[in-house]
């Protein structure tokens, strides 16, 4: 049964033809093979990104994204309906948190995208709506299923888990000794600025977060990715780049620079191209590995910080 659900993506018990008919009939009265309904889909102008609006059985909906790369197909999975982290530049926090997604709802996002696109999924990033480590147990169950022999058999190394910095859960994840790529939504090199942009920093400041990241890298042997959204005139100065370089010196890590994507409600703007070049150069001069993310899907609201909670009954109208 697990193989039918997790690998074949069966939509009903009737499809599980190698199970006895009587057993399937009895089971039908006690269980339902869940599936998320595709309410809407939007394709970017470049054709490399598709955003799906998936309806849940309680009337809410989540956004899931397919990204087409030269090296494969990546699905960006949401972990919660809404988010309670309240990052100032992120649309997912608008309207607050409703509930955690069940592990099956995380998995079904991957299957729904595979069905709708007809393309095999090679990578997963837990970077959609919500904070994955605020839904720890369901997130780890999802990882176990998507990497299992009865599932899609994805390599753990092809899964990236993003967090804004829940230190106890990062430490717990490190003890799991999984080969996941940990991505930290950093966005500021000091507590004063990060307290404003990423409010969870007030509970888990950089003095706790950075050692937790170092522990994760040490226990897993995996390089930690530090995501840094560049907000024009806010966190994109050369001085802050030098602070960031000092903060990460000696850590097995990598900085991923992301020019801010439009979220009208946030009031933030993208940095100038010159500010991006200078920020990157300062990090490189400091010996910090750095890359500039090629953003996909900004024109359809599918890029970093743009996914948001919607209600199923209103989604189709939008």
From Swiss-Prot:
Alphabetical GO biological process terms: rRNA base methylation; tRNA methylation
Catalytic activity: adenosine(2503) in 23S rRNA + 2 reduced [2Fe-2S]-[ferredoxin] + 2 S-adenosyl-L-methionine = 2-methyladenosine(2503) in 23S rRNA + 5'-deoxyadenosine + L-methionine + 2 oxidized [2Fe-2S]-[ferredoxin] + S-adenosyl-L-homocysteine; adenosine(37) in tRNA + 2 reduced [2Fe-2S]-[ferredoxin] + 2 S-adenosyl-L-methionine = 2-methyladenosine(37) in tRNA + 5'-deoxyadenosine + L-methionine + 2 oxidized [2Fe-2S]-[ferredoxin] + S-adenosyl-L-homocysteine
Signal peptide extent: none
InterPro entries registered for this protein in UniProt: Aldolase_TIM, Methyltransferase_A, RNA_MTrfase_RlmN, rRNA_lsu_MTrfase_RlmN/Cfr, rSAM
Binding site for [4Fe-4S] cluster: 83, 87, 90
Positions that bind S-adenosyl-L-methionine: 130-131, 162, 185-187, 261
Subcellular location: Cytoplasm
SS bond partners: 76-304
UniProt entry keywords in alphabetical sequence: 4Fe-4S, Cytoplasm, Disulfide bond, Iron, Iron-sulfur, Metal-binding, Methyltransferase, rRNA processing, S-adenosyl-L-methionine, Transferase, tRNA processing
Function as written in the Swiss-Prot or TrEMBL entry: Specifically methylates position 2 of adenine 2503 in 23S rRNA and position 2 of adenine 37 in tRNAs.
Protein known as: Probable dual-specificity RNA methyltransferase RlmN
Species in which this protein is naturally found: Desulforudis audaxviator (strain MP104C)
Gene expressing this chain: rlmN
